[in-house]
């Protein structure tokens, strides 16, 4: 009986299934077709998938496919590098043409602690097309980014050998700089966060900027720039934005050796046109005769007499033209890469060399990089990478205004053409007709400085090690998508500088008046007796310059070395998984980093005349000067991120980071930096695609978040002490105030502030991305606003001497920055192989000061609430020129002028500029009186 019932049930189910077959057949259609590219070549391996299901197939070698699809279902056809297309059943098309994705929306973009599809980005993140920088011969990677990404400014670089460019992202939000480094962004290379503020002597350097500039372009895989609240994932150090760099790894295939070599020429585009010798003499004569301050000299007596002017017509000592040369730049890279199913590898070495345009300037650098990624098992991966660089820069020791060689161009440019370099054996000190007017160049001779054996050498060495271990839970159906990763990074950076300077002899004319006595060569056909009686004498200040101030020394040798030792550890749990139309991702990471820097400096002065430049072979006549400093800091951070996407249309991201900094007191160690962003891909909406056909892609973005800064030196919350040799007590019986030797005493370095804490920077951003004309023309528009609050600033006000220390930094500054960015890009191709791109980047930015350390006795130049950081240029307001004495009389009468630039009316001459009487003297309440008839540079300047 039991078996009969089972038999009846089975027959009933079979009949029901047979009866349902026509219905199933009626609701399911077979979709057949072929997928081609724009040249109608088959696309092999294109994915055909029923949206919201796991049902799908791929095209064969001829681009053909077959798929059963129920009525009303959508099918998406996609392939990497092409724009996906969707169709709804029933289907009428059998030939599907996929267009190339010029916008690369499926491209994976590196973001903080991971990657995302470009189409899923919700923040203001710019990517740099690295192919555009591969063939640029430059010693500074930053200089190659100029114009390639919106919202970044690139300044400097490549004008001199070894000079790095600097990058700023958007409008900076700083009221007080710390050595100039904290205006720069944070640099993250292969996951390692480089220190931004490492003290070298009395200045700060950004190790990340140096590491970025030293990268060989041939090893760079991607560059991403975080400009808005998306940078909050890096917390405390990301207030000025973040630049993320990923270097290349080996790709599946046989070993591949590649060579890339570039040669470049560095030369001037234009040069200011200077007066020739004759014009120079005529100008100085005119200036002399119009100078109202030369009351003791007959104004009709010219500086250069007519016979001198005639001779100067044939004098043309253009030293800049003599020494300027086109400079060669070259870069060579050799890379080896490859991969198997079990491992990938990449190794490379490169050499860069750059000569200078003036004299003995040169810079060269070696780079190396080697890394391997190993698949230990199906679910375990490991990687290790070693990289570094060694650079050397040589410059002459310029002794004009300091030891820097930066003034050589301006000095040669303004060199009067009538003055030669040498007269016989005498090296001439180049300067103009009067000492006071050209005191900054009166002891300069380019040839002597290039060949006297003095030098300034800088050597840098950087080594980095990155290692990681990853475990994938893909074997577990419940934990699929979860990965655990541990990374360790270490960098050692060394900077050495050697300076060697000796005295040198320059000469100039003993007398400076009379016919023929302004020239260094006899005048042909004239009475040269005055010249023959003129003697040369030694310029007594032709001596080395130390620490930007002239010292009465005969020479010096200095050495300095900075070593920075840093490490970073991360433990990260990352999860990414799709559930139908839902895509979920997230990560949690613990990060610890420490930095230790040591600086050593030594200098000895007044060696005997001959030396090999080695300190142990020189007998010194002075006590060596030495300095040693050591700094350390550490950070502990917790990072979290959550991403959600529905049907690639609705995008949401939450970020949070909690940082600790030992720069603050223990109760203020921690800062919390969250952010949220959202995006809506409007062009994915069915109603949009049916009604708006001229827009191919449209996405709206919005973000808001908090970042911070620890803008101070370490241990300011603890009382620290220094020593002072000159202000200690004096013991003895003498009644003189400074008799005897002062005892060395301890002093407070600064008052403490345990309440000092993180700066806060709230960042808001609205973005719009849209493409038209078959995705060939794209626009990206961003508007941003940043509220900088509780900024840690110093007080300029003096404190009572009884305090015994300078005032501490306090969190009170407020500054707003804002701007708009627009990027327009046209991408197209001619024929099958020729592709081109035209890109325009533009924008506007500004700032507004709300609270800062206002001047206690403000002047009209003082900052006021609502002012910009950049106050522009101040100067006198010119309203004309005195062309006659009648003009002078009318001006003095009309405006009741009693004093004009320190002169009475009788001393004012035609040819002088007319300045406006803007205001009077400053009043007791801080305001200024109206025009008072006194025109002076102190009270009458305006913002030009």
For each feature predicted by the language model, list its residue ranges:
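Active-site-proximal flexible loops/turns
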Residues: 44, 197, 267, 394, ...
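Conserved small-residue
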Residues: 258-312, 514, 716, 723-728, ...
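Contiguous N-terminal and early-domain "leader" segments and peripheral loops that mark the onset or edge
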Residues: 121, 154-209, 290-351, 355, ...
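Long, charge-rich C-terminal accessory regions
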Residues: 504-505
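Short, small/polar-rich motifs associated with maturation and membrane association
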Residues: 2-369, 381-383, 387-389, 402, ...
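Short helix/loop capping segments that flank catalytic or ligand/cofactor-binding pockets
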Residues: 178, 197, 234, 267-269, ...
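Extracellular/periplasmic, surface-exposed regions of secreted and cell-surface proteins
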Residues: 330, 365, 371-380, 385-390, ...
């Amino acid at each position: 009986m039991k078996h009969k019932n089972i038999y009846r049930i089975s027959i009933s189910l079979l009949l029901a299934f047979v009866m349902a077959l026509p219905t199933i057949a009626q609701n399911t259609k077979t979709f057949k077709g072929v997928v081609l590219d724009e040249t109608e070549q088959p696309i092999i391996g294109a994915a055909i998938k029923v949206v919201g299901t796991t049902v799908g197939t791929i095209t064969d070698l001829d681009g053909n496919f077959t798929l059963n699809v129920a009525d009303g279902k959508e099918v998406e056809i996609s392939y990497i590098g092409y724009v996906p297309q969707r169709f709804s059943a029933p289907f009428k098309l059998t030939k599907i043409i996929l267009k190339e994705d010029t916008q690369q929306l499926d491209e994976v973009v590196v973001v903080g602690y991971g990657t995302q599809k470009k189409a899923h980005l919700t923040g203001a993140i710019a990517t740099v097309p690295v192919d555009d920088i591969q063939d640029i011969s430059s010693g500074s990677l930053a200089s190659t980014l100029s114009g390639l990404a919106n919202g970044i400014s690139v300044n400097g670089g490549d004008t001199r050998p070894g000079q790095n460019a600097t990058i700023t992202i958007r409008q900076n939000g700083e009221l007080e700089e710390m050595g100039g480094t904290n205006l720069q962004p944070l640099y993250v290379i292969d996951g390692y966060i480089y220190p931004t503020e490492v003290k070298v002597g009395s200045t700060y350097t950004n190790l990340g900027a140096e590491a970025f500039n030293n990268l060989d372009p041939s090893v760079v895989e991607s560059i991403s720039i975080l400009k808005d609240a998306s940078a909050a994932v890096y917390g405390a150090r990301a207030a000025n934005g973040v630049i993320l760099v990923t270097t290349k790894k080996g790709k599946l295939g046989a070993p591949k050796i590649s060579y890339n070599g570039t040669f470049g020429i560095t030369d001037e585009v234009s040069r200011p046109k200077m007066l020739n010798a004759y014009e120079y003499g005529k100008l100085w004569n005119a200036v002399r005769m119009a100078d109202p301050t030369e009351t003791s000299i007959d104004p009709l007596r010219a500086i250069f007499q007519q016979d001198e002017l005639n001779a100067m017509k044939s004098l043309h000592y253009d030293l800049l033209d003599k020494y300027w040369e086109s400079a060669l730049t070259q870069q060579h890279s050799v890379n080896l890469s490859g991969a198997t199913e079990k491992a990938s590898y990449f190794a490379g070495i490169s050499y860069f060399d750059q000569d200078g345009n003036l004299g003995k300037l040169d810079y060269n650098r070696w780079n190396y990089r080697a890394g391997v990624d190993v698949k230990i098992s199906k679910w375990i991966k490991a990687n290790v990478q070693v990289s570094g660089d060694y650079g050397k820069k040589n410059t002459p020791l310029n002794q004009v205004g300091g030891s820097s060689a930066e003034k050589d161009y301006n000095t040669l440019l303004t060199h009067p053409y009538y003055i030669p370099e040498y007269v016989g054996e005498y090296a001439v000190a180049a300067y103009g007709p009067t000492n006071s007017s050209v005191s900054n160049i009166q002891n300069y001779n380019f040839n002597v400085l290039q060949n006297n054996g003095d030098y300034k050498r800088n050597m840098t060495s950087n080594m980095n090690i990155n290692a990681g271990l990853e475990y994938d839970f893909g074997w577990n159906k419940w934990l699929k998508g979860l990965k655990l990763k541990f990374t360790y990074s270490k960098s050692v950076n060394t900077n050495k500088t050697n300076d060697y300077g000796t005295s040198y002899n320059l000469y100039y004319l003993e007398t400076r008046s009379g016919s023929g006595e302004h020239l260094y060569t006899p005048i042909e056909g004239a009475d040269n007796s005055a010249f023959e009686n003129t003697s040369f004498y030694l310029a007594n200040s032709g001596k080395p310059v130390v620490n930007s101030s002239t010292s009465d020394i005969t020479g010096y040798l200095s050495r300095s070395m900075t070593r920075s030792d840093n490490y970073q550890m991360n433990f990260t749990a990352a999860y990414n998984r799709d559930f139908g139309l839902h895509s979920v991702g997230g990560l949690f990471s613990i990060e610890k980093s420490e930095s230790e820097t040591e600086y050593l400096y030594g200098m000895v002065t007044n060696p005997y005349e001959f030396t090999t430049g080695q300190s142990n072979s020189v007998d010194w006549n002075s006590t060596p000067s030495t300095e040693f400093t050591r700094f350390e800091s550490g950070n502990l951070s917790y990072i979290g991120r959550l991403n959600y996407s529905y049907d690639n249309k609705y995008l949401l991201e939450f970020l949070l980071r909690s940082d600790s900094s030992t720069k603050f007191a223990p109760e203020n160690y921690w800062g919390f930096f969250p952010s949220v962003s959202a995006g809506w891909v409007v062009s994915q909406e069915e109603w949009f695609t049916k009604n708006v056909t001229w827009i191919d892609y449209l996405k709206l973005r919005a973000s808001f978040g908090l970042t911070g800064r620890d803008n101070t030196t370490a241990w300011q919350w603890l009382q620290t002490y220094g020593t002072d040799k000159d202000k200690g007590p004096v013991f003895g019986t003498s009644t003189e105030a400074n008799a005897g030797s002062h005892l060395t005493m301890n002093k407070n370095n600064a008052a403490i502030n345990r309440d000092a804490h993180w700066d806060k920077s709230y960042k808001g951003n609205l973005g719009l991305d849209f493409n038209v004309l078959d995705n060939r023309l794209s626009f990206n528009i961003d508007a941003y606003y940043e509220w900088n609050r509780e900024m840690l600033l110093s007080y300029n006000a003096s404190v009572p001497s009884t305090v015994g220390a300078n005032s501490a930094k306090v969190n009170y500054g407020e500054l707003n920055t804002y701007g708009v960015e627009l990027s327009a890009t046209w991408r197209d191709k001619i024929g099958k192989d020729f592709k081109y791109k035209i890109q325009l980047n533009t924008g506007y930015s500004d700032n507004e000061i709300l609270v800062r350390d206002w001047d206690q006795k403000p002047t009209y130049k003082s900052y006021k609430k609502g002012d910009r950081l950049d106050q522009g240029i101040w100067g006198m307001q010119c309203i004309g020129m005195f062309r006659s004495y009648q003009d002078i009389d009318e001006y003095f009468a009309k405006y009741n002028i009693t004093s004009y630039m320190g002169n009475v009316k009788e001393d004012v001459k035609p040819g002088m500029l007319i300045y406006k009487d803007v205001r009077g003297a400053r009043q007791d309440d801080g305001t200024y009186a109206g025009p008072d008839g006194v025109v002076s540079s102190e009270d009458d300047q305006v913002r030009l």
